[in-house]
A protein has these predicted regions:
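Sequence-level preference for short, compositionally simple segments enriched
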Residues: 1-166
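Pro/Thr/Ser/Gly-rich low-complexity, intrinsically disordered linker/stalk tracts
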Residues: 159-180
């Protein structure tokens, strides 16, 4: 995607997904991955890649920008591969700043060389305790009374700070927008 390619309302969990940025032909900046309203987006065990669209500058993006101050977006255990800009989170043109979005957070994200990527907005860095709280409430906060067939709720941080769980595979969307 280019700009806000995951946006709007609805609570969503993206697990073990590839997010591919597409740069513009005249510049490398791909924009923003998310623009959440007052809803929750959780990205865990994902990989951010890019198609530079023939541009010599690598396509990069922000994790997201807050459509409202109630935006809640978490990137956890995500391979950023140098595609996320150093600030990590952007402001919205309506005056809502990334700092206003108290639900923005990141935890254990890595660069392609295996070093940890932390955005320059330090208030968005989650602790292991905060991460474990998110994991404990995925079903109630994100999924409500719906449980996907391949969902695995056991994903705690071990003492070394590593995260582990089985991937959710083979999830398909039918024409009625129901996940199968």
């Amino acid at each position: 995607g280019n700009v806000d390619y995951i946006c709007g309302g609805g609570n969503m969990v993206f697990d073990d997904c590839t997010l591919e940025l597409y740069g513009y032909s005249d510049k490398g900046n791909a924009g923003y991955i998310t623009a959440a309203q007052s809803t929750k987006y959780l990205f865990r065990n994902c990989t951010i890649t890019g198609n530079d669209n023939g541009n010599s500058t690598q396509a990069t993006a922000y994790y997201g920008r807050p459509w409202t101050s109630g935006a809640d977006v978490k990137f956890i255990n995500t391979q950023t591969n140098g595609r996320v800009v150093a600030k990590g989170w952007a402001d919205w043109s309506n005056g809502t700043t990334a700092e206003d979005a108290t639900g923005f957070g990141e935890y254990c994200n890595l660069n392609s060389d295996g070093t940890e990527f932390k955005s320059s907005i330090t208030s968005k860095q989650l602790t292991a305790t905060q991460y474990n709280s998110i994991v404990a409430t995925v079903e109630s906060d994100y999924l409500g009374n719906w449980t996907p067939a391949h969902y695995v709720s056991t994903m705690a941080v071990n003492n070394s700070g590593s995260i582990g769980a089985d991937a959710i595979n083979n999830v398909k969307i039918n024409s009625g927008n129901d996940l199968l």
